[in-house]
Amino acid sequence: MAKETFYITTPIYYPSGNLHIGHAYTTTAGDVIARYKRMQGYDVRYLTGTDEHGQKIQEKAQKAGKSEIEYLDEMIAGIKDLWGKLEISNDDFIRTTEIRHKEVVQQIFERLLAQGDIYLGEYEGWYSVPDETYYTETQLVDPIMENGVIVGGKSPDSGHEVELVKEESYFFNLSKYTDRLLEFYDENPEFIQPPSRKNEMINNFIKPGLEDLAVSRTSFDWGIRVQSNPKHVVYVWIDALVNYISSLGYLSDDDSLFKKYWPADIHIMAKEIVRFHSIIWPILLMALDIPLPKKVFAHGWILMKDGKMSKSKGNVVDPNVLINRYGLDATRYYLMRELPFGSDGVFTPEGFVERTNYDLANDLGNLVNRTISMVNKYFDGELPAYQGPKHELDKDMEQMALDTVKTFHENMDDLQFSVALSTIWKFISRTNKYIDETSPWVLAKDEDQKEMLGNVMAHLVENIRIIAVLLRPFLTHAPKQIFSQLNINAPELFELESIEQYGALTEPIMVSGKPEPIFPRLDSEVEISYIKESMQPDKIEEEVEEELPSKAQIDIKDFDKVEIKAATIIDAEQVKKSDKLLKIQVDLDSEQRQIVSGIAKFYQPEDIIGKKVAVVTNLKPAKLMGRKSEGMILSAEKDGVLTLVSLPSAIPNGAIIK
């Protein structure tokens, strides 16, 4: 009987620079899902790859004095090397410069053109080269005005400058499919995850009216040519999104993989591109009469204390640095444990070192070390066979093991990786406590308690085996080391089925003579400093004091220029050497911003985290006490007391307040 299939994809990454830990986070999460599903018995196909066309690649190659493909080959080699270091278990790596992809894109474009879903027109709009995205005037951040007319601004996705572009372009008729898309959302409520993303797509993009999408360019030539009009190259989203089916052989002479694995079970990506995957991609598939994927999951951003981590800001963490110095398992564990999948998380060197020392070295490493040492000390290395529970502590422990396995599966099915790991670590903590409760060193002094002592050792080793099995999707080395040191060689004891019931070690086993540390402890001060040094940007901005614009009376026309959006405060801290300023990070959905606010005398930083506030987003950036401030949080003032203007939590981040 054929196995049930499971098809998972990451976004294809844009190789205009070295990938950072945010890319590693997405791809590791996909790998965790793939490994878990394989353990469940699924026939898994895991796809990742690179999006290699566009103006930015062309410019990067020219600047490097290379052809586009020479530049790309070097970049892709680095990406594949990183995926190798992370031991990503992808089954395919798609490059959009491959013939197998190009031919499919060209066929799809001509088909959509022939059936009237694509038409030729002229486009004028604000274009960001790094984002490869057009924006309307209302979407621009920090618009520049001259005589009441917008003459520039920044991308809402990245903050890069935009330029006004006017050129002949083919358009994809998105609006034609609006009703059908909304109907699909209603019939498939789990399609967009987390659920808040669905509300954002509907309220921020669909309800205001979908605009037809420019799908070709003539102002550069590094891309896939439109066969019927070769002066046009296919624009990014029809090119990039099609990789999910071109990699399976759709429209090729051999489409067996497409028939076997499509529709995809899940597309995972960072939240800034969820609208392309939940609006454009479904509509494109509808136009092609292809079944839609089962789920689109948008995870949050990895933030620094000073805002979003990105290549353009120069505040990135290189995953190679972490892997090379601390090992793969420590890196994978931190990413999946510290950062809740679906929400934003903050990377800190302190957090990385603490997780490695406390969770891995102390809790897990010491449990394995202590147990193997006791089996060697009290039984000359030969673990007695499991005989069943001997007292209430054993029964409680066995029940917790079964409950842990059940909860773990629930967490994994919900893609709550950090919660799944927390569940495992509660079991690790309980097992460590079991040692203290049973006091093997006391039992060993009484020959009449030899059987009871053996029973304790059997429970400890069985617990460790269960822990190692549960960790297999996350850690690629430690579970193997644990099995090796316990001298457990039967392959069936590595699998999920073996932990559905407690007590699989029914025969004596001889553990290793001397346990080897799985996770050595780190010198916290040294390693925190090392990570911080590796994160330093190439260029530090000089601290320059700038004042915010002075107050003035305005009329209604001027007020209309003010852009106010809903945002959630995600981090706050006191500005050093200032008794009135807080440095605050806010989530505006499409971006994170840093705002310096003079509310320190009225609020403690921890008191405002999680508050929904109103933010003026189109103020010119300023610096206060050397800290960049990118907006203003609205507050009310009475008798010298400031109170933040709070908004209902139901208002989505990024919603415009009028």
UniProtKB/Swiss-Prot annotation:
Keywords from the UniProt entry: Aminoacyl-tRNA synthetase, ATP-binding, Cytoplasm, Ligase, Nucleotide-binding, Protein biosynthesis, RNA-binding, tRNA-binding
'HIGH' region (motif): residue ranges: 13-23
GO biological process: methionyl-tRNA aminoacylation
Residues in tRNA-binding domain copies: 558-658
Record-listed E.C. numbers: 6.1.1.10
Keyword GTP-binding in annotation: no
Catalytic activity: tRNA(Met) + L-methionine + ATP = L-methionyl-tRNA(Met) + AMP + diphosphate
Cell compartments where the protein resides: Cytoplasm
Assembly and oligomerization: Homodimer.
Protein name: Methionine--tRNA ligase
UniProt source species: Staphylococcus saprophyticus subsp. saprophyticus (strain ATCC 15305 / DSM 20229 / NCIMB 8711 / NCTC 7292 / S-41)
